[in-house]
Amino acid sequence: MALLPHFSTLGSGHTVLMLHDADGGHLTFAPQVEALASLGYRAVAWDMPGYGNSAPIEPYRFKGLAEACMALIDALQCGPVTLVGHGMGAMVALEVAVRQSALVRRMVLCAGGPALDAQAMADWVEPRLAALDATQGDMQSLAQALVPQFTGSGALPEGVRLATHALSQVYRGSYRRALQALSTFDRSAGVLGRLHMPTLIIGGAQDRCTPPAALQALAHVLPDARHLSLPHAGHWPQLEDPDGFDGALADFLASSRVLH
C-alpha cells in the first residue's frame, strides 16, 4: 500500500483541503490554514508527492497525483471536501473532480488551470526550467531569482518572503518532474464542462503564469464558476494579498454552504 502524503491540519468542521503549486509545499497555504480554522473549518494542507515529507511517485503525472489526493481524502474520512488548488494544485483538484466528483463538494482554483495554448504553457514552465539549469539546482538561488519575477506590484513583503522560502525548500528533482508534468494535463473543455460543483476561480491581475484571460476562459467552461481577480497580485494571490484572498474564500465558503 502506498504511503499517504504528508499534511498539516488545524481546526474542526467541514474539511478544506489545500493543494499547493509546483513552486512550494504546504507552507504556501500557511495563512489560510489559520484563517480557515478560526472560521470553523478543518483546514488541511498537503505536501504533494515528492514534496516535503511526501514520498515521490513514478510516473509523475496527474493520474498518480489525483490518486494520492483521493487516498488522503479517504484516509481522513472527510469527504466530500472543498478543494483549494493553487497553480499546479488547481489542475490536481480538477483531475480529482473528474475522476471522483462525489469527493468534491466545491472547488477554489487559484492562479491555475489549463493553459490557453502551448505558448502560454511554455511561458509558465520554461523560465522555471531555465532557472533550474542556470542555478545548477541551487533552489535557494532559484527562489530568490524567480519569485520576484512573478509577483505583483502590491505584493505583501512577508508573503513574498514566504513564497521564496517555500520554493527554496523544494527538492530540485521533484521540481523538475513537476514542471515537466504540467504540460501533460489534458482534460478537455467537454470533460471539465461536466463538473457542476460550485467553483471560485481567483487569481492575480498581474499574474504572468496564469493571466486573467486564462482564468476567465476556465470560468466559462465550468457550469457553476465565477472569476475574481485581485488587482495588484501576481502568481501567489494567497500570500501576496492574504486579506483579499481570505475574504473571497470565506465569502465563497459561506455562500455555497447556504446555497448548496
Cite the ranges covered by each PLM segment.
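Alpha/beta-hydrolase fold catalytic core
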Residues: 1-17, 38-41, 78-79, 247-260
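Conserved HGGG/HGGXW glycine-rich cap/lid loop of the alpha/beta-hydrolase fold
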Residues: 8-55
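Conserved acidic catalytic loop of the alpha/beta-hydrolase fold
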Residues: 64-81
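Gly/Ala-rich beta-loop-alpha elbow adjacent to hydrolase catalytic centers
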Residues: 85, 89, 93
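Flexible "cap/lid" loop of the alpha/beta hydrolase fold
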Residues: 94, 98-99, 104-135
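Conserved alpha/beta-hydrolase catalytic His-Asp/Glu region
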Residues: 118-123, 136-193
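Short beta-strand/loop motif that positions the catalytic acidic residue
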Residues: 195, 201-203, 207
